[in-house]
Amino acid sequence: MAEVEEQGRKLSEESTDESEEEDTEEEPKLKYERLTNGVTEILQKDAASCMTVHDKFLALGTHFGKVFLLDIQGNVTQKFEISSVKINQISLDESGDHVGICSEDGKVQVFGLYTREGFHENFDCPIKVVALHPQFSKSNNKQFVTGGNKLLLYERNWLNRWKTSVLHEGEGNITSVKWRGNLIAWANNVGVKIYDIGSKQRITNVLRDNTSLRPDMYPCSLCWKDNTTLIIGWGCSVKICAVKERDPTEMRDLPSRYVEIVSAFETEFFISGLAPLADQLVTLYYVKENSDHMEEEFRTRPRLDIIQPLPEGCEEISSDALTVRNFQENQCRDYRLEHSEGESLFYIISPKDIVVAKERDQDDHIDWLLEKKKYEEALMAAEISFKNIKRHDVQKIGMAYINHLVEKGDYDTAARKCQKVLGKNMDLWENEVYRFKTIGQLKAISQYLPRGDLRLRPAIYEMILHDFLKTDYEGFATLIREWPGELYNNMAIVQAVNEHLKKDPTNSILLTTLAELYTYDQRYDRALEIYLRLRHKDVYQLIHKHNLFSSIKDKIVLLMDFDKEKAVDMLLDNEDKISMDKVVEELKDRPELLHVYLHKLFKRDHHKGQKYHERQISLYAEFDRPNLLPFLRESMHCPLEKALEICQQRHFVEETVFLLSRMGNCRRALQMIMEELANVDKAIEFAKEQDDRELWEDLISYSIDKPPFITGLLNNIGTHVDPILLIHRIKEGMEIPNLRDSLVKILHDYNLQILLREGCKKILVADSLSLLQRMHRTQKKGVRVDEENICESCHTPILPSDTAQAFGVVVFHCRHMFHKECLPSPGSIPGIQYCNICSAKRRGPGSGILEMKK
């Protein structure tokens, strides 16, 4: 089989024009191989004159009057000696059980292949064509036609005799005939006719276009595409005819069917054969010697084209020039094209050669892609059609692609394709790794090595890591981060890194990688030391992930120096593992760090670190004065005397004022504001906060000889102190800045207060009236008294069991009920009775509203 394929490929290479192959990269549509075996021996001694194709076998006629039955591979299965001269045509029925043969000496034989019984006749003229009814074996009246100088129809009657009918004559020799269903198509010197055997009517006559061509040299090619579509090729003309049913209303004396030419076009070369291929046409061309379209040495090579018919033309899909044996000696009439409808096989028959053309399958497509070095497309095609390919293996194609990429020097792509191609084959993986090592490209393949459930031997990974350690520290660090620690011997790699650190002890990349290796090996203390030494950002993640708090108790200062915020957050979040006292003890010699820790602790919880609040006063004063006053305001545990002492030593006026006021020495605090800050606004604000008349007096006394202070007081005192007190104490003749504006503001504020009071009074009166009316409406409503109610004094039912007797009940607005005799005597105000229960809480709502008597 491999020999046949190689022969086919060789023929295909021979049959494709080399100049066109250089210009185009289009993949051929068909592949070719010679029909060999018994055919080769036959054609060495004889020459092929005709051939008919059946799905099961082939029938070959020769110039020496012999007919050979062949299998699909060309082996001879049967041989018939029919005549001593050329066999003109062979016809088979659909079942392949009967054959019809005609020869140049006028012999016609129709017989069964499994029995020689049949029709045997000698005519006095050459018989050019013969055609059996497609259902010859199954029909009772066996029918066939022969054509010489006239077309004769033979059918066997009920007496088992052959009846002859002339279908056509008088227009020269019949050169071609094709029978499909009930339709017989034939060609003579004038044109093509179609006869309906069912209605016994000739339904069309398609005239031949180029009458200058000799019919015997350029015979007509007929081919049925289906039961109603006939393809006619004659000379350089192609016509596609559709047989259609005629409308019964238009028949009159016309046949029941008619023919419509649906497509007609001219070709570049002479047509030797036609065959359908789906909705396209396969055409066999004879190229005349005087054609200017081809090179001199290829002028008479036949061509096999695939064309797409259009209504008024055609489009060429593919074109192959075929090198058949002795093609230089052949004429147009020497070529024939036969096809097998079942398998889309096309047979090109010439006197000394038979070539089989077939559609290319997926294997052929991949062959072509590999030949053109389109390995990626070949790999993709193989993956998509892996169930249908027979000669190719996806992995082998992938390996060829990888080899091609390596040869090109595209190592990165080659390494990337290894993942897809090598898959789970660990032996192939190891071979590729060693190949990449040989060419010095381990770096390219390293990132694609298996690292999941399927793994290579640890030695492979270690080899790559050692190679990176020699040439690329960053690449080595990347692999250590990306590869799981189980892939290689961790201790061996640690030892190798330590050897390199002896040469370069400060290399941060190697140190970081060593810390990661220690982490994989669960030696977290060593990893932590390296991270702290390098101030690496992952140190906190390492501590949290592996719970290394016991290892950092003596390294708190280092952590704080690296990142105060992260360190403090971590320490505060894990107080159960590192106590607050331990942290304070470690930071006692670094007060600035201690302040950061205690400050965040205070922000989280004002009471948790209360025993350190006294120490925090000096820390705030030293390192963070802006937060000292908020601390003093919020802390309930700092000693005020100590705080006052520190603030006075450092002359922190605002903090001292706050402490004095908190300790009750408001006058001293106000004095400091006026004397040391000289800020009347703050003094006024302080006096407002304390709301102490004596402080206001002190403030006025201190400000009375200071015009700017008087202005500030006039602008702000109106709502707290009567401005007249201040105005009366102003000395006559004292010049006060913006006095008029201040007085206007005082009057405006006074008017505003009066308006507010009046407005409030109106609202109060309106609300009081509304509430009084609502209460009056409520009190006017009746109160339900029934057997379920009880006296709040004696706790017996409020209504007597015998309602016919006289009784008295008192019901209050509070809904408490009493028997009249159970109430105490009225109060000091005659006529007003109070509820005993509610009068202890308030007066008024419990006044009696209803007295029931009966």
Curated annotation (Swiss-Prot):
GO molecular function: zinc ion binding
Membrane topology: Peripheral membrane protein
Region spans: Disordered: 1-30
CDD domains, A to Z: RING-H2_Vps41
ZnF start-end (RING-type): 791-839
Extent of Acidic residues compositional bias: 14-26
SMART domains, sorted: CLH (SM00299)
Skewed-composition ranges (Basic and acidic residues): 1-13
GO cellular component, one term: Golgi apparatus
Observed effect of gene inactivation: Disruption of the gene results in melanocyte pigmentation defects, decreased body length, and bladder defects associated with abnormalities in surfactant production or distribution, consistent with abnormalities of lysosome-related organelles. Mutant animals also have defects in the optokinetic response and eye movement control system, suggesting cerebellar dysfunction. Microglia from mutant fish show morphologic abnormalities, with larger or more numerous lysosomal compartments and increased expression of acidic lysosomal markers compared to controls.
Pfam families in the cross-refs: Beta-prop_Vps41, TPR_Vps41, zf-RING_Vps41
Location in or out of the cell: Endosome membrane; Late endosome membrane; Early endosome membrane; Lysosome membrane
InterPro entries: Clathrin_H-chain/VPS_repeat, TPR-like_helical_dom_sf, VPS41, Vps41/Vps8, WD40/YVTN_repeat-like_dom_sf, WD40_repeat_dom_sf, Znf_RING
Keywords: Autophagy, Coiled coil, Cytoplasm, Cytoplasmic vesicle, Endosome, Golgi apparatus, Lysosome, Membrane, Metal-binding, Protein transport, Transport, Zinc, Zinc-finger
GO process terms (BP): cellular response to starvation; endosomal vesicle fusion; endosome to lysosome transport; macroautophagy; protein targeting to vacuole
Ranges of the CHCR repeats in the UniProt entry: 568-712
The protein's assembly and partners: Core component of at least two putative endosomal tethering complexes, the homotypic fusion and vacuole protein sorting (HOPS) complex and the class C core vacuole/endosome tethering (CORVET) complex.
Family: Belongs to the VPS41 family.
Biological role: Plays a role in vesicle-mediated protein trafficking to lysosomal compartments including the endocytic membrane transport and autophagic pathways. Believed to act as a core component of the putative HOPS and CORVET endosomal tethering complexes.
Protein name: Vacuolar protein sorting-associated protein 41 homolog
Protein species of origin: Danio rerio (Zebrafish)
